[in-house]
Amino acid sequence: MKKRLIFTGLLALLFAACCFAQKPYKVVFYNLENFFDTINDPEVNDDEFTPEGPKKWNSVKYAKKLGNTEKVLFDIAGIDKDYPIVIGVSEVENRSVLEDIIATPKMAPGNYRISHYDSPEAIFGVAMI
């Protein structure tokens, strides 16, 4: 009986140690809200987001949106730079935009990879990084 009690106590301690030793992970979803590059792709309905389009989308606007996205995602990482293990995104035009996001100085240390679905309607592009 005494051995069983000791065994149960040790098992409970081992279980508790394993549970408390686990590191929480961050998983994030972010709607990028019409994040387009500036290149007109005839395969994609992106005419609105080109330098000639109604939104006059250009490299200055692109760089500003890229910087804002970098800031938001880096702020989620926090001061301890605990980067999210997965970031789901929507409304992204193509892989090139995602590559620019993960190459920014604050996001590059996260060592992200990309899984992306190209949609003919660019607004519906989704990805995980």
Report each predicted region and the residues it spans:
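N-terminal, active-site-proximal structural segment of metallo-dependent hydrolase catalytic domains
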Residues: F20-P105, N111, S115-V126
